[in-house]
Regions:
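Short-chain dehydrogenase/reductase
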Residues: 2-100, 114-120, 124, 128, ...
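Active-site loop of short-chain dehydrogenase/reductase
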Residues: 4, 74-75, 102-103, 151-165, ...
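C-terminal helical subdomain
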Residues: 190, 212, 229-282
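A short, exposed helix-loop element centered on a Lys and neighboring polar residues
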Residues: 144-145, 197
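Conserved Rossmann-fold SDR core element
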Residues: 102, 193-199, 203-218, 257-264
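A short helix-coil junction within the Rossmann-fold of NAD(P)-dependent oxidoreductases
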Residues: 26, 99-100, 113-116, 146-158, ...
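Catalytic loop of short-chain dehydrogenase/reductase
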Residues: 112-114, 123-127, 158-205, 217
Length: 282
């Protein structure tokens, strides 16, 4: 039986890390991409607003994720990748194709964090908007362009975009900084959200499956850092591993095919199907 191979971007921590581990448990070798390769060489995070400087490094690295993948008896392939830097994206994909001949599953999970995520239209510098579009749209499209030909040659593959309600709800419930996201983040997510539809209409008849997955509110390392000073009640947040369980099910289950043309709530899917028994929403 041919070995199953997956690529997960943004896999040094949070949702991407748990997706990588869940896919390894499901029998996939997993290429993992992010900026932070080693815990000994941490990459500082950017502040989500121009009004606060915060460059603390978050826990997590590709090195640690790779160890978890390999603990499941699967191969890992750590790749340094910065989604705001297209050459680094292309270099990482060239490595995957050279080493593994491509992948059967792509999880476009990586995202850009920076000023504009929680800033108003007027406060956000125009170059910050460009970074969101580069990371969430241009780089995501380029990754699809680079993995899709081999999938088509093999007669099938699965592509998942980790989306957000910020990407498909055109009228936000709250302004940025008061429970809502800034236009920079919303632009990036909405642009990335449209990729799946184009994949399906152009290549669905050729065996390519594609899904948009909204993780909902998840208590990642990044969110924990942002919330620690606010006193916000995060008790209803899902653990990242719940999203990992949802994605692993979508990738391998034929029953998931009917969900391809919808906005999939990872949390609702997990609860409905009992995919992560350790979590029950309060």
């Amino acid at each position: 039986m041919p070995q199953k191979r997956a690529l997960v971007t943004g896999a040094s921590r949070g949702i991407g890390k748990t997706i990588a581990v869940a896919l390894a448990k499901a029998g996939y070798d997993v290429a993992i991409a992010a900026r932070t390769v080693s815990k000994d060489d941490p990459t500082p995070e950017h502040s989500v607003t121009i009004h606060r400087q915060d460059s603390r490094a978050l826990p997590g690295s590709l090195e640690e994720t790779a160890a978890l993948v390999e603990a499941e008896g699967r191969r890992s392939l750590p790749l340094r990748m910065d989604l705001t830097d297209l050459p680094s994206v292309e270099t990482a994909l060239a490595t995957v194709i050279d080493r593994w001949g491509g992948v059967d599953v792509l999880i476009n999970n990586g995202r850009h964090i920076g000023p504009g995520l929680m800033d108003t239209i007027l406060d956000t510098p125009i170059d910050e908007y460009m970074k969101f579009l580069q990371a969430h749209a241009v780089s995501a499209i380029r990754i699809v362009q680079l993995v899709l030909p081999a999938m088509l040659e093999r007669g099938g593959g699965t592509i998942v975009t980790i989306s957000s309600g910020a990407g498909y709800d055109w009228y936000p419930a709250n302004p940025p900084g008061h429970g809502g996201a800034g236009l920079g983040y919303r632009l990036g997510k909405s642009a990335g959200h449209t990729i799946v539809g184009s994949i399906l209409v152009e290549h669905g008849h050729q065996g390519i499956r594609a899904f948009n997955v909204d993780p909902g509110f998840v208590l990642t390392e990044r969110n924990s850092l942002d919330l620690e000073a606010t006193g916000f009640d995060a008790s209803a947040a899902a653990p990242p591993a719940a999203v990992g369980a949802a994605v692993a099910w979508l990738v391998d289950s034929p029953e998931a095919d009917d969900l391809q043309h919808s906005n999939i709530s990872a949390q609702a899917l997990v609860l409905e199907r009992g995919l992560y028994p350790d979590w029950r929403k309060p």
